[in-house]
């Protein structure tokens, strides 16, 4: 049997080396965007949400750690909240939450991760909660 794995510390260190001290922003995209793992920079994204109350959010209280029980390196943060997103009815629907490593503008800001995030905007509060299993937004397993 072939064995090939990263230690939990290496998983954590991979996140730490790339993201420690970085400004990480969250964008919400509509289904106009077609996810593509070959996309590198935020300038390659399309379909960013445009509605009342929307703005890109910066992750706060970022913590990078390893979880030896779940065998992951992970990045957790305070859940970003949009207080009143979209019109009262007929607002756009989100399809994805995208995490980027911000660097002056979209042409230099690297895409970290694209996650499914379906929400019909209706002027209500929206909180982007972390993955329930890992209690994190990003992880390497």
Predicted regions and their residues:
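Small cysteine-rich, disulfide-bonded extracellular modules of the LU/uPAR three-finger superfamily
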Residues: 1-94, 102-141
């Amino acid at each position: 049997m072939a064995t090939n794995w990263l230690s939990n510390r290496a998983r954590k260190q991979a996140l730490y080396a790339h993201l420690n001290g970085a400004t990480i922003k969250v964008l919400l995209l509509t289904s106009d965007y077609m996810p593509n793992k070959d996309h590198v920079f935020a300038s390659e994204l399309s379909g960013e949400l445009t509605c009342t109350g929307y703005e890109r959010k910066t992750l706060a209280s970022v913590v990078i750690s390893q979880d030896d029980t779940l065998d992951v390196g992970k990045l957790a943060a305070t859940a970003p909240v949009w207080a009143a997103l979209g019109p009262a009815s007929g607002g756009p629907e989100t399809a994805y939450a995208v995490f980027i490593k911000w660097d002056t503008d979209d042409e230099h800001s690297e895409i970290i991760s694209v996650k499914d995030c379906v929400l019909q905007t209706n002027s209500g509060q929206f909180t982007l909660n972390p993955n329930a299993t890992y209690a994190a937004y990003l992880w390497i397993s």
